[in-house]
From Swiss-Prot:
Region named Disordered: 177-196
Alphabetical GO biological process terms: carnitine metabolic process
HAMAP family: CaiE
Gene3D superfamilies associated with the record: Hexapeptide repeat proteins
Name of protein: Carnitine operon protein CaiE
SUPFAM superfamilies in UniProt: Trimeric LpxA-like enzymes (SSF51161)
Pathway membership, UniProt: Amine and polyamine metabolism; carnitine metabolism
Cross-referenced InterPro entries: CaiE (IPR023446), Hexapep (IPR001451), Transf_Hexapept/Carb_Anhydrase (IPR050484), Trimer_LpxA-like_sf (IPR011004)
Organism of this sequence: Escherichia coli O81 (strain ED1a)
């Protein structure tokens, strides 16, 4: 793992969390219980404090950063999709930020809300509970349905289960020269399917 102290502050990672070896955590970073931090994620706590609360996930290539005297927070069971950028914002409990979205300084995403992929949430935005946000700049288009929230929670559960699976079986290796016969397919732990 790539952990770096900065001006005396050392990242704090709960022993039940999983941080991929290619992720980078610098300085004032706090990672809670059961959190998943994916490959190539950058959590750079060299100005503001970065907090990832219990059960949340920060997926591949995500960036977290913020200004001095601010906290960038991903709330409990938060779900941050591949390539998202969080800068000085607060993501509420059980909220989802879609792939390649950008959430700017002082923005607050409400609990159980969903930010659609590729959205841009402006600095200072104040969201409410259970909003579907989309666009550039993002705006609330409607409430998150019960089915959508259930789908989000299944996806988050997959990442929470992935923590244990990674602790148990992920290790560096050399590639095979060819595919073996009857190569098995990996299975998830829930019945979640992609949204159509």
């Amino acid at each position: 793992m790539s952990y770096y102290a900065f001006e005396g502050l050392i990242p704090v990672v709960h022993p039940t969390a999983f941080v991929h070896p290619s992720a980078v955590l610098i300085g004032d970073v706090i990672v809670g219980a059961g959190v998943y931090i994916g490959p190539l994620a950058s959590l750079r706590g060299d100005y503001g404090r970065l907090i990832v609360q219990a059960g949340a996930n920060i997926q591949d290539g995500c960036i977290m950063h913020g200004y001095c005297d601010t906290d960038t927070i991903v709330g409990e069971n938060g779900h941050i999709g591949h390539g998202a950028i969080l800068h000085g914002c607060v993501i509420g409990r059980d909220a989802l930020v879609g792939m390649n979205s950008v959430i700017m300084d002082g923005a607050v995403i409400g609990e159980e809300s969903i930010v659609a992929a590729m959205s841009f949430v402006k600095a200072g935005f104040r969201g409410e509970k259970r909003q579907l946000l989309m666009g550039t700049p993002a705006r609330a288009v409607r409430s998150v349905s019960d089915d959508e929230l259930h789908w989000k929670r299944l996806n988050t559960k997959e990442y929470q289960d992935l923590v244990g699976r990674c602790h148990a079986s992920l290790h560096e290796t050399q590639p095979l020269r060819q595919m073996e016969e009857n190569r098995p397919r990996l299975q998830g732990t829930t019945d979640v399917m992609p949204k159509r």
